[in-house]
């Protein structure tokens, strides 16, 4: 479901395009708060400290992936606006391969550098580090999903669809909270 944002009233088109992205950001904040509450209620202060200590690293990795996906999205939107279907397909294919390879590389480096990460993040408590290491291992296993969501979302937004990424995010948030409670 794509929408030609070059037709019709500009303000209306921009608002209709932006509202799902704003709602998506609010939804992400809600499930981050839910994660924090669930961890603190069920796993205790050390687990909460482990998750909190991981935040800087996870923000960095996610920002790198998101930046690459958004840059690709700019190229996609240019190709889409030019009505260059072949160029759009080629851009999508090339950027997917590049970002997927970088995602794998970042993941491998993160796994290999876990002890260095501990020093960099200055986590001195062994109990917190043990929980943090376990948490990061799970997160690193899911980084491919983060890449796929961000990549597909940027592609869809580039062709005018900001609703589908919101739906994907809503389903993901509900699954995340449900799995948090289950495990």
Model-derived regions, located:
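Residue-level recognition of transmembrane alpha-helices
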Residues: 18, 25, 52-55, 99, ...
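Interfacial/gating helices of multi-pass transporter permease domains
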Residues: 39-59, 127-131
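Short alpha-helical transmembrane segments in multi-pass integral membrane proteins
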Residues: 1-18, 76-142, 178
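Residue-level signal for short hydrophobic patches within transmembrane helices
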Residues: 7, 11-30, 34, 57, ...
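Small-residue-rich hydrophobic transmembrane alpha-helices
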Residues: 48-108, 146-165
């Amino acid at each position: 479901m794509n929408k030609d944002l070059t037709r019709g009233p500009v303000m209306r088109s921009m608002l209709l395009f932006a509202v799902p992205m704003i709602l998506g950001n609010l939804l992400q904040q809600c499930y981050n708060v839910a994660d924090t509450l669930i961890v603190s209620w069920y796993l205790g202060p050390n687990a909460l400290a482990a998750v909190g200590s991981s935040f800087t690293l996870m923000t960095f990795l996610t920002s790198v992936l998101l930046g690459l996906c958004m840059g690709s999205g700019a190229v996609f939107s240019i190709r889409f606006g030019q009505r260059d279907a072949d160029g759009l397909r080629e851009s999508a294919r090339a950027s997917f391969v590049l970002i997927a390879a970088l995602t794998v590389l970042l993941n491998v480096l993160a796994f290999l550098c876990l002890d260095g990460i501990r020093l960099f993040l200055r986590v001195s408590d062994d109990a917190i580090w043990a929980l943090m290491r376990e948490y990061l291992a799970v997160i690193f296993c899911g980084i491919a999903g983060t890449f796929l969501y961000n990549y597909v979302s940027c592609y869809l937004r580039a062709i005018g669809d900001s609703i589908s990424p919101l739906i994907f995010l809503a389903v993901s948030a509900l699954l995340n909270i449900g799995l948090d409670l289950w495990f």
